[in-house]
């Protein structure tokens, strides 16, 4: 486990602060669209293997704080977006599909919602936590831009001037295994440190689209990232 290796190295070298980056997915699925934002002491109820491993890593990090006094801080972030993001992620994937004249591929109904936070706001949040956060505490890093995947697709189509083709540019495909309905987190602890979100959603989305329209050629081959369900080879089948 990579986290264990890093914790051991941090313990040996007496690091001043160990900031562990987790995810809002460890809280599990919001029961409805009216579910209150999750606060840091909410019980962890991960619903998929990725979230379960992130929760397990958190417990390991906390154990090093309690057992060895390692100065740890844990962050749980929502969806990050902005220039330079890998093309398999939602916004760059949709942008690159549209730029190539293809329909965006929406899992299920597309009504699943996520909060999005611009990468520059995320960077400032980490800087704030690194210098001001309390050792041993957990901090949510979330945006105020809750959007359904379908809404994001329609906004990208509009930004790219393709509104008259919207009906043909949205393709619904079978959903992913247990695709959580909603994640939403409370930022109060982070805001108490002096951080606040600065980038408006509309401006951040436009900046992101313009970057990918200009620089997506930097990725040598992104075709695999643009399919509806990227194939992951099984370790068992490879033996």
Q: Could you tell me what each predicted segment is?
A:
Residues 19-21, 75, 94:
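Hydrophobic structural elements of the Rossmann-like NAD(P)H-binding subdomain
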């Amino acid at each position: 486990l990579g986290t264990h290796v890093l914790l051991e190295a941090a313990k040996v070298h007496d690091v001043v602060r160990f900031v562990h980056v987790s995810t809002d997915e460890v809280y599990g699925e919001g029961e409805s669209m009216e579910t209150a934002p999750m606060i840091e002491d909410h019980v962890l109820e991960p619903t998929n293997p990725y979230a379960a491993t992130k929760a397990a890593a958190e417990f390991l990090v906390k154990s090093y704080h309690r057992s060895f006094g390692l100065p740890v801080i844990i962050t749980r972030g929502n969806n990050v977006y902005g220039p330079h993001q890998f093309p398999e992620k939602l916004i760059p994937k949709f942008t690159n599909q549209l730029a190539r004249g293809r329909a965006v591929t929406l899992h299920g109904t597309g009504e699943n919602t996520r909060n999005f936070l611009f990468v520059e706001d995320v960077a400032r949040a980490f800087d704030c936590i690194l210098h001001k956060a309390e050792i041993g505490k957990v901090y949510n890093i979330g945006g105020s831009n809750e959007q359904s995947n379908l809404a994001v697709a329609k906004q990208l189509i509009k930004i790219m001037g393709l509104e008259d083709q919207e009906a043909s540019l949205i393709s619904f495909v079978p959903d992913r295994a247990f695709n959580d309905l909603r994640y939403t987190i409370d930022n109060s602890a982070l805001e108490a440190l002096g951080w606040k979100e600065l980038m408006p959603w509309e401006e951040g989305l436009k900046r992101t689209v313009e970057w990918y329209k200009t620089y997506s050629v930097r990725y040598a081959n992104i075709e695999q990232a643009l399919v509806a369900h990227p194939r992951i080879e099984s370790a068992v089948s490879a033996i």
